[in-house]
Amino acid sequence: VEGMQDRLDVHGVKGHRDAVIDGMTVDVKSCSSYAFKKFKEGRLREDDPFGYISQLSSYVYAGKDDPLVTNKTQGAFLAVDKQNGHICLDVYDFTEELKDKETEIKNIVKMVEGKLPRKKLDPVPQSKTSDNKKLGMVCSYCEYKQSCWENLRTFIYSYGPEYLVEVNTEPKVPEVFT
């Protein structure tokens, strides 16, 4: 294991790779059992709401001239199931992504430097039996959710917070007031 938390720069975007193991760039992810299944089954390319594939392929790209990285086209996620302690190594070939990485990064920088998007994603039902509406998973992690939803209310459930945008039935759990 080498190159732990080395600072990387891809066309002005900075980050830290977790490690280089046996010459391969590796990113460690702790996750729920649900998310772990995607890593275990190698399905992250099909369902990647947090952009992990882009992140890891960027680390692989940044290592193209690094002598620690001997595998210049592959990267792996070392995924750890937080609930059960299971571990798996999910390896990806990034040959195709690496061809367009410079353009991808420049487009991302341009997007981030621009204005915040005006269109917000539609809320989803809180559950099959509730008439409340909540933020979808991607929006629930966004730091700008308050900007999009002025009347957003946060309720704390045993499994974590839920961000409700429409409350028709008052939840019987604590609410966080900000």
Where are these regions (language model features)?
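Short amphipathic alpha-helical face segments that pack within enzyme cores
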Residues: 54-62
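Glycine-centered tight beta-turn/hairpin loop motif at sheet-sheet or coil-to-beta transitions
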Residues: 12, 21-23, 84
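Extracellular structured ligand-interaction cores
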Residues: 14-16, 23, 72, 139
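A short acidic, glycine-rich active-site loop
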Residues: 42-54
